[in-house]
Amino acid sequence: MDAVTDTPVTEMPAPFVFTDAAADKVKELIEEEGNPELKLRVFVQGGGCSGFQYGFTFDEAINEDDTVMNKSGVQLLIDSMSYQYLVGAEIDYKDDINGAQFVIKNPNATTTCGCGSSFSV
């Protein structure tokens, strides 16, 4: 309840899911880098066999158009252009028989390539 208007407050669902496994791995990588100011930037760019591909990098700066998500002490940054392609996506980290990697499950992708690193909408 909003104390001022006495109306129910509806919380907006997070625009993406950043799993505990992904946050834990990012935290581990940041600790290895020795720079607690680092944040994980996830982005979409043109390329790959399906038209778009995902990218991951560390960044110290939060840009004006970034959406910031906090999870387990880790900040995830997504720029406004990439945001539109990632709404509803799950960003996870898998370590299995196929290897260790960050994985994005994206409901907006209409097709993906065989390796899963590029997609189209």
Curated annotation (Swiss-Prot):
Which residues does iron-sulfur cluster bind? C49, C113, C115
Q: Which UniProt keywords apply?
A: Iron, Iron-sulfur, Metal-binding
Annotated GO biological processes are: iron-sulfur cluster assembly
Molecular function as annotated in GO: 2 iron, 2 sulfur cluster binding; 4 iron, 4 sulfur cluster binding; iron ion binding
Q: How is the cofactor bound?
A: Binds 1 iron-sulfur cluster per subunit.
Q: Which cofactor does it need?
A: iron-sulfur cluster
Q: Which HAMAP family does the annotation name?
A: Fe_S_insert_ErpA
Task: Please give the function described in this protein's UniProt entry.
Answer: Required for insertion of 4Fe-4S clusters.
| Protein name (database record) | Putative iron-sulfur cluster insertion protein ErpA
Q: From what organism does this protein derive?
A: Paraburkholderia phymatum (strain DSM 17167 / CIP 108236 / LMG 21445 / STM815)
Q: Quote the gene name from the UniProt entry.
A: erpA
